[in-house]
Amino acid sequence: MDHPHKWHRKLVNCNSDFIFKSRGHFVSISSQLGQHNFTIFNRYHLKKRIVFQILVNSSLRFSEQNFSITQNEAGIWKQLFNSPQSFPHTDIPSEEGTKVIL
């Protein structure tokens, strides 16, 4: 049985910084070709470091490592969670209901 938050490969257009929401998580990604880090937050303020590889075909491969979140970051993201309607989004067809927030 797969972990409920297991990441499946996403095919996305990676030309600029963006945030996407998947299964209640908000993710901030610096999207350039090569290996980079991005940060995932959930509603309980668990912050994970995600190491990913953007390939030429713009597929993303993910691996996760937990790390701590600061009080300031928790406050900022709590505000974001409390007012998600202030962030326009574009739907991406996927089984997980991923949304990209441009």
Curated annotation (Swiss-Prot):
UniProt protein name: Putative uncharacterized protein BSC3
Gene encoding the protein: BSC3
Provenance organism: Saccharomyces cerevisiae (strain ATCC 204508 / S288c) (Baker's yeast)
Highest taxon of the lineage: Eukaryota
Misc. remarks from the entry: Overlaps YLR464W and YRF1-4.
